[in-house]
Amino acid sequence: MGVTKKPDLNDPVLRAKLAKGMGHNYYGEPAWPNDLLYIFPVVILGTIACNVGLAVLEPSMIGEPADPFATPLEILPEWYFFPVFQILRTVPNKLLGVLLMVSVPTGLLTVPFLENVNKFQNPFRRPVATTVFLIGTVVALWLGIGATLPIDKSLTLGLF
């Protein structure tokens, strides 16, 4: 937790600013018009200038042209869809695969209700939520790595 600056209410300059209605923060400077008219547009234009500059100086290459007669043997999704792809690939029933995919966010929504503790406490004082997180991370990594392997080695990751 950072150290916050406490205002000196005996300061006559601060008291004068508070009397004018300018005391919504410690320094007495209002967000309007200073921040909203001068600082924010400079930051926004600077961000746009950086993006345009990078796009002009280093344009992204368009890849090789598509060839519909030379498709790969197995098409893989993007890396962040590997665990879901592995679930759909290994479960024999489509309905069961969809139910398993729906159960992941449903299970994540129930984690805060598993323990009735303050949310800012140490994770080691919340063993159930920490265990659910660690098991979920291991399972997601296992499914993600397995999705890159052939179907016969995907569940065991080729170890057995």
From Swiss-Prot:
Name of this protein: Cytochrome b6-f complex subunit 4
* Bilayer topology term: Multi-pass membrane protein
Give UniProt keywords alphabetically. Answer: Chloroplast, Electron transport, Membrane, Photosynthesis, Plastid, Thylakoid, Transmembrane, Transmembrane helix, Transport
* Main localization of the protein described in the UniProt heading: plastid
Its assembly, as annotated, is: The 4 large subunits of the cytochrome b6-f complex are cytochrome b6, subunit IV (17 kDa polypeptide, petD), cytochrome f and the Rieske protein, while the 4 small subunits are petG, petL, petM and petN. The complex functions as a dimer.
**Record function comment:** Component of the cytochrome b6-f complex, which mediates electron transfer between photosystem II (PSII) and photosystem I (PSI), cyclic electron flow around PSI, and state transitions.
> Which GO CC annotations does the UniProt entry carry?
chloroplast thylakoid membrane
Q: Name one GO biological process term.
A: photosynthetic electron transport chain
PANTHER family documented for this protein: CYTOCHROME B
Q: Which InterPro entries match?
A: Cyt_b/b6_C, Cyt_b/b6_C_sf, Cyt_b6/f_cplx_suIV, Cytochrome_b_C_euk/bac
Which Gene Ontology molecular function entries are recorded, alphabetically?
A: electron transporter, transferring electrons within cytochrome b6/f complex of photosystem II activity; electron transporter, transferring electrons within the cyclic electron transport pathway of photosynthesis activity; oxidoreductase activity
- State which residue ranges cross the membrane: 36-56, 95-115, 131-151
Where does it reside?
Plastid, Chloroplast thylakoid membrane
Task: Provide the coiled-coil residue spans.
Answer: none
The record, for PROSITE patterns, names:
CYTB_CTER (PS51003)
Entry similarity comment: Belongs to the cytochrome b family. PetD subfamily.
Add the further remark from the entry: A longer mRNA that is not produced by splicing has been shown to be transcribed in barley and maize. It is not known if this mRNA is translated.
